[in-house]
């Protein structure tokens, strides 16, 4: 198995979680599916219209002869039908065909709005030029010898760009998400992987993150990682790889707390440090 960031990041919670996710892959969530649609619309606009379609309300009629207003879930000959018995023609399927992705109408509208915002954002448009999107890279980690792989959102000859869709509406909130979600580790993983794979020079520019908000007015911000942030990401990656090697060698994948823990409540808790108990307690 070639190690990727989507797997390695689980070690930041516990080795047990990583092992569990390898053995029990998560089904795709609706937010993840929406994120993939946004990525396609922004990074592969020529493929988007032919790949992503939306569901509609059921095109059948009720017994009363009125249009069915249920959301369509079965597809036949360009039309959507609901799951009510008799509404979908024989031969209707859950998917329109191979290579076609389905999202609801609101999601498709949101996807297009996000893509338009990124295109209209001058710094982001400039970054997403002169390179190639959705690049698969493979490399052997120089320090550990582990075979690795990754899928880079956008790769230019001189720099790597990562795209994120977010509900955050301020720079401060998004920066907090970068730390909490380990995005700095992810971008460091891709950058150093691209360098080791010969896709970036050793003196490549620090990578960028383009963040597009999925909340109105679909604002866009482009960030370049500072050197300190990139180095923090690299340290995180090295720590996780070292832990992965240890667990693999031992065949032991412990949870968050394999040993007995002492529980100590914080100082602000009622009763701590002689504090009086509030009426609510």
What are these model-predicted stretches?
Residues 1-69, 77-149, 257-262:
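Metal-dependent nuclease catalytic cores that hydrolyze phosphodiester bonds in DNA/RNA
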Residues 24-27, 99-103, 171-181, 226-228:
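Short histidine-centered catalytic/ligand-binding loop motif
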Residues 33, 37, 185-193:
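Short amphipathic alpha-helical face segments that pack within enzyme cores
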Residues 38-39, 154, 237:
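A residue-level signal for conserved active-site and pocket-lining positions in enzyme catalytic cores
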Residues 68, 165-169, 212-216:
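Short connector loops/turns at beta-strand edges and beta->alpha or beta->beta junctions
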Residues 150-176, 190:
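Conserved catalytic cores of phosphodiester-cleaving nucleases, focusing on short active-site segments
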Residues 189-281:
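Metal-dependent nuclease catalytic regions and adjoining charged, substrate-binding loops involved
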């Amino acid at each position: 198995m070639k190690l990727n960031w989507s797997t390695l990041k689980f070690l930041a919670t516990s080795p047990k979680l990583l092992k569990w996710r390898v053995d029990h892959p998560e089904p795709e969530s609706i937010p993840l599916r929406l994120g993939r649609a946004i990525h396609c619309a922004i990074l592969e606009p020529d493929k988007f219209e032919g790949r992503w379609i939306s569901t509609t309300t059921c095109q059948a009629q009720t017994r009363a002869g009125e249009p069915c207003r249920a959301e369509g879930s079965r597809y036949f000959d360009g039309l959507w039908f609901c799951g009510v018995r008799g509404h979908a023609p024989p031969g209707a399927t859950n998917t329109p065909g191979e290579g076609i992705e389905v999202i609801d109408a609101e999601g498709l509208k949101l996807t297009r709005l996000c893509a338009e915002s990124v295109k209209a954002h001058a710094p982001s448009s400039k970054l997403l030029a002169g390179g190639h999107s959705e690049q698969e890279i493979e490399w052997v980690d120089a320090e550990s010898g582990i075979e690795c792989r990754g899928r880079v959102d956008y790769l230019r000859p001189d720099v790597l760009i990562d795209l994120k869709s977010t509900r955050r509406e301020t720079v401060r909130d998004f920066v907090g998400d970068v730390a909490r979600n380990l995005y700095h580790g992810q971008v460091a993983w891709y950058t150093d992987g691209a360098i080791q794979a010969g896709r970036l020079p050793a003196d490549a520019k620090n990578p960028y993150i383009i963040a597009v908000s999925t909340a109105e007015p679909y604002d866009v911000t482009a960030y370049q990682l500072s050197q300190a942030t990139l180095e923090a990401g690299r340290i995180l990656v090295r720590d996780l790889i070292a832990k992965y090697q240890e667990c693999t060698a031992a065949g032991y994948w412990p949870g968050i707390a394999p040993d007995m823990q002492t529980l100590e409540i914080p100082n602000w808790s009622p009763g701590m440090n002689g504090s009086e108990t509030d009426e609510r307690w």
